[in-house]
Amino acid sequence: MTNFEYYRDFDDFQRRETINFFLSKFPLASQKQLQDFLEQARQAYVQLRQTNPAHLDWNQTLLYLAQKFLPEKQSEKDRLKKILVLQEQLKVRYEGEIKRQSQQNSELLIQLGQRDEEIIQMQQLFKEKERQLEVYQKQLNEAKEYNHKLEEHYNKTLEEALKEYEQQCTDAIHRRDEEIQAIFTSKLNEKNSEITQLQTYLQSAVDENEALQKQHKLVLFKNQKYEKMVSDLQVDLARIQEINNSLTSEKRDFQRANNDLVKQYNKLKNRLEQKLGEITNAQVNGQTHTVSLADTSQQFHRPQEAVIPQTQVISYTLDDMDDDMEVEETPPTTNKDLPRGATQPKRNSIKRVSKLID
């Protein structure tokens, strides 16, 4: 873009290059700011073309124009700072939520640790009962051995007494075994029920921990989704702001054009009313002048001009003027379709009526 001889006007190529340069410098600028920068670049280009700079770089001119937009860039920085502040607030909020969830998880882990300690205590108690049972079993074996020795010692002389005593000892041992077995079975069932209940508590705690982990993942997913929604909303708000700015400028241009049209209409209406008054007042003088022209028409051999009747002049009212301003008549294709001596009317009705009045 250093050679200005290739480009006589500020065409689409310079426009695209200028837009790319501006967006690279100010990526978050509005549509109005871009239009202002393009207008300044076009004016600068025209001035440079007039001075005919043979060795001037167009990029330097763009950089000089971009320096004038530093306040706009500062406003973009403020806007980015506000966005960062909002992001920090959301970050603090979600960090607090995550800390609260972590605290709840820690409490649940503490409860699980307490349950584990209770299970360990029950296991130790169960082992102690097993040791007691082994002691009882050892005592039983010793008693059996002692009975066996007595049986051998008194086999010959006290056979009947030993048989009776053995039966009594056997019955006593059997009853004692049954009692021990019943006590052990009841205790074992109690411990098994306690262990089952503790396992149920442990499983429920594990399920709650998994549910909390799922909720934690869901919170993280919602956080990412919310951040994405915030970024999309920011993009949509920027687009809406651009559309609103363009609509505001279009509305302002339309109101200005409408006001100009109303002023032109009122001006034309006043002029027409003034001319109609002048024509109406001049009808009497016009008739007298027509008679004098008729007396002298034979001497100069000039055709007499037709006088516009008063009824014909008055019939052209303001409503007809409005119709002329609003509806544009389609002229005939050729002059043959027109009456003799008439010409095709002009297309601009407002200019035609103003010329007729003048």
Swiss-Prot record:
Question: Where is this chain compositionally biased, Basic residues type?
Answer: 348-358
Q: Where is this region: Disordered?
A: 324-358
Q: What is the name listed in the Swiss-Prot or TrEMBL entry for this protein?
A: Uncharacterized protein MG269 homolog
Taxonomic source organism: Mycoplasma pneumoniae (strain ATCC 29342 / M129 / Subtype 1)
